[in-house]
Every structure is written in C-alpha cells, then in structure tokens.
C-alpha cells in the first residue's frame, strides 16, 4: 500500500485514508463495477463542498476500463478496498474536466434526459453551450481550474459478470442485445404491479436505442428501424405514466409519436385517456373518434371511456353548481 501511495504522489495525487477498508485490495480488472459516495471539495482552507452524492441520495457507479471522462477517478478508486473512506488531493492536470463531468452527473441526479446535450443543435446554441455549463460554480471552475479534493467512501466492488450492467456503460453491440431483455423485464414488472420499476426499465431500453439512433442519419433505413423499436417501448412507458397519473408526460410522448406515425391507434387511445383525465373533453373525444376510425373493433372499449368521461363531467358540473350556490348564499 505504501508503494501505491508513493506512485500516486508522483502523479500529483495525495491520498489520506480516513477509515480502513475490509479484505484484500480488489484486482479491478476491466469491467469491475465500483459503487461509492463522493464529495468534491475546494482545496483552499475553507474546503467548501462543490458536489455531494449523498445529498442527491444515490451513489456513483463506475465501470473500470470504460474510459470515464474523469480518468483520475478510475486511478484513485483502484487503490481502495470495500468499506474504505479516503481523501485524494489531485493536481490541476487531473481536475480540468471535472466541471463537464459534474454537469452530466447533476443532470442525471435531477432526472433529466441522460442524452441531453448530445443532440444536434444550431451553431449559436452550441456556442452558448460551450461558454456556460448552466451552473455558476462550475463555470467559475472551468474558467479557473484548480486542485480539488475527492472524498470517496467505497461501498461495493463487483467483479465482471456478477452484476447487471447499466445501459450507459454498454458498447453499441451490448445495447442492441440488451434491449429485448430489458423490454421483457419491464413487461414482467408491469404484470406484477411494479409500475415504477417497469417504467424505469422501459426508459433504459429507450435510452439504449436513442443512443444508437443518434449515430444514424435521420430518416435513413437504420434510423427508421430503430425508431420503430422505440415506439412500442415509449407506449409502454406511457402506460406506466397513465397508471402513475402523470398525464402531461403521456400527452407529450403520445403527441411526439403521432407527429411521426399518425395512424398509431395505441397512441391516440392513451392520449385520449390522458386528455380525459385532465378535463380536455373535446381533445379526448377527438382522439377516441380517431381510434374508432382506425380500428372499429375497439368500439366497446372507446364507448366505456366516453361514458366514464361524460359521468365525470356531469359530476364536476354538479360540484361546481353546489360550490357556486354556497358562495352566493352567504
């Protein structure tokens, strides 16, 4: 261990062990998954915190050998055992890219699209993107790079093949092979009533396909083929959101499908249900009418939805009348 710390020091990294770990130092061969909490601090006397994974409620997961954008994290993680807590003071040469990495991690923590920022955009938008990271502290750090302290608490180290790999860590070939399996897992979870977990699986499968689609020319046969795989997954995701009563997300996604495929019966039906739930009666009726036009066999189901909508509207009208009577009776 002394030799390891000496080599780190030669490379501009000073390690200080706060709590010893347990067992032997893992081999950390390529594909090993390290799960840890991290805290990033300024190296000045105040040592103010820049980022803290505990505050976000989810630890960091790093796959060794996947060329993470902040190589120093892979370097320091390789020196740690499970249960160990340590601080690493890293020279500027190791921390220059931290602001960009931190922005991505913050986006993920806020539940934003993991592909956000990777899509094509106009030159002006790209110029703005490069000039600002959207966080004042990260902008300041990018303009004035400095040594940083990484406080790492190693929770778990898993060897290759002993864990389910996250989509973002997969190669293109691995993504393509994983999508059907993730889709099946989502279906199983939905059947068992685990709707939130099913939605997460569908989301992962969509993210895999979107990532592959970004590498194709829009409108090309390969791009269209991937889009046709995305659509049923997105409809399943919308079904989960209907159950979770997140209706506006359903409206958004179903509309995006119908902008491309205006004969998709399931998208009209789910959007109609979402419109009905948020009292957009005319829009709901129009979508249900389109369902009947495209598939008359669904008449019994559509009739049931329309009756339910009419009953809710009558009930709401009666409640509104009672409320107004109460107001004017005072």
Curated annotation (Swiss-Prot):
May play a positive role in AHR-mediated (aromatic hydrocarbon receptor) signaling, possibly by influencing its receptivity for ligand and/or its nuclear targeting. InterPro entries: AIP/AIPL1/TTC9, PPIase_AIP, PPIase_dom_sf, PPIase_FKBP_dom, TPR-like_helical_dom_sf, TPR_rpt. One of its GO terms (cellular component) is membrane. Its main location: cytoplasm. One of its GO terms (biological process) is xenobiotic metabolic process. Disulfide bonds: none annotated. TPR repeats lie at residues 179-212, 231-264, 265-298. PROSITE patterns: FKBP_PPIASE (PS50059), TPR (PS50005), TPR_REGION (PS50293). This is AH receptor-interacting protein. Gene3D superfamilies: 3.10.50.40, Tetratricopeptide repeat domain. Keywords: Cytoplasm, Phosphoprotein, Repeat, TPR repeat. Residues 31-121 form the PPIase FKBP-type domain. GO terms for molecular function: aryl hydrocarbon receptor binding; enzyme binding; GAF domain binding; peptidyl-prolyl cis-trans isomerase activity; transcription coregulator activity; unfolded protein binding. It comes from Rattus norvegicus (Rat).
């Amino acid at each position: 261990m002394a030799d390891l710390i000496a080599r780190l020091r030669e490379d501009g990294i000073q390690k200080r062990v706060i709590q010893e770990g347990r067992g032997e130092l893992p081999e950390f061969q390529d594909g090993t998954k390290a799960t840890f909490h991290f805290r990033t601090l300024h190296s000045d006397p105040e040592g103010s915190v820049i980022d803290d994974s505990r505050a976000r409620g989810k630890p960091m997961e790093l796959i060794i050998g996947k060329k993470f954008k902040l190589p120093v994290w892979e370097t320091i993680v390789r020196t740690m055992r499970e249960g160990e807590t340590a601080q690493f003071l890293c020279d500027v040469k190791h921390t220059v890219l931290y602001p960009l990495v931190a922005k991505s991690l913050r986006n993920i923590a806020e539940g934003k699209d993991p592909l956000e920022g990777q899509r094509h955009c106009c030159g002006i938008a790209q110029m703005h993107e490069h000039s600002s990271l959207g966080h004042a502290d990260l902008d300041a750090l990018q303009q004035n790079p400095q040594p940083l302290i990484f406080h790492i608490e190693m929770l778990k180290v898993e060897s290759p093949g002993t864990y389910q790999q996250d989509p973002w860590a997969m190669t293109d070939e691995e993504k393509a092979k994983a999508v059907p399996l993730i889709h099946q897992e989502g279906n199983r979870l939905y059947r068992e009533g685990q709707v939130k977990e099913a939605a997460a699986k569908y989301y992962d499968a969509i993210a895999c396909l979107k990532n592959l689609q970004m590498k194709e020319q829009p409108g090309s046969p390969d791009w269209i083929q991937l889009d046709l795989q995305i659509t049923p997954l997105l409809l399943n995701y919308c079904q989960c959101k209907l159950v979770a009563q997140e209706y506006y997300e359903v409206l958004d996604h179903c509309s995006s499908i119908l902008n491309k495929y205006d004969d998709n019966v399931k998208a009209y039906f789910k959007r109609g249900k979402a419109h009905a739930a948020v009292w957009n009666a005319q829009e709901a009726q129009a979508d249900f009418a389109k369902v009947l036009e495209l598939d008359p066999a669904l008449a019994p189901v559509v009739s049931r939805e329309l009756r339910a909508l009419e009953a809710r509207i009558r009930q709401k009208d009666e409640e509104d009348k009672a409320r107004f009577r109460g107001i004017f009776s005072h």
